[in-house]
Design a protein with these regions (language model features):
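Helix-turn-helix repeat elements of alpha-solenoid scaffolds
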Residues: 1-12, 44-50
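Alpha-helix capping and helix-coil boundary motifs
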Residues: 2, 40, 65, 89-92
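Amphipathic alpha-helical repeat scaffolds of TPR domains
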Residues: 8-11, 24-38, 50-56, 70-84
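Flexible helix-coil transition and linker loops at the boundaries of alpha-helical arrays
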Residues: 14-22, 58-69, 83-88
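Hydrophobic/aromatic side-chain positions at a characteristic register within alpha-helices
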Residues: 17, 36-43
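Short N-terminal helix-initiation segments at or just after the protein's N-terminus
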Residues: 18-27, 113-116
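TPR/TPR-like (Sel1-like) alpha-helical repeat modules
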Residues: 42-60, 84, 88-91
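Eukaryote-biased recognition of C-terminal alpha-helical segments
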Residues: 72-121
Length: 121
């Protein structure tokens, strides 16, 4: 399977909580995203942005198990950190810094509306 298809497949597994009992699924997604960047198949900014949005979308999905939603929410900071680092680099295009601020503001608004309740056992 080509690397980009593999990354899309891993993203689908995370988004649909297909392996909700295996938190390594999120780590595999990060690993494959790094591989795509290293091989020149995708830029780090795009991988980080898509990953952050995927994790936030998953965290907001009330149809998924709460523990999986919490795992995704816990991991959102990682791609945001990558985006912040790229935006602060001296050779980064100026629009990336403002795009980072726009994305983080949008995520903060989404977080303020997010409700993750643990279902009763």
């Amino acid at each position: 399977m080509p690397p980009m298809e593999r990354w899309d497949f891993l993203a689908m597994r995370v988004r649909c909580a297909l392996y909700a009992d295996d938190p390594r699924a999120i780590d595999h997604l990060f690993t494959m995203g790094g591989y795509l960047h290293e091989q020149g198949d995708a830029c780090a900014w795009d991988v980080a942005r898509k990953t952050a949005m995927l994790l936030m979308d998953t965290a907001e999905d009330t149809a998924l198990p709460w523990q999986w939603r919490c795992q995704c929410l816990d991991h959102v900071a990682r791609p945001l950190g990558v985006m912040q680092h790229i935006g602060r680099m001296s050779d980064a295009p100026p629009h990336l810094s403002s795009e980072y601020r726009r994305i983080t503001q949008a995520l903060l608004q989404r977080l303020s509306r997010l409700e993750i309740h643990r279902e009763s056992w």
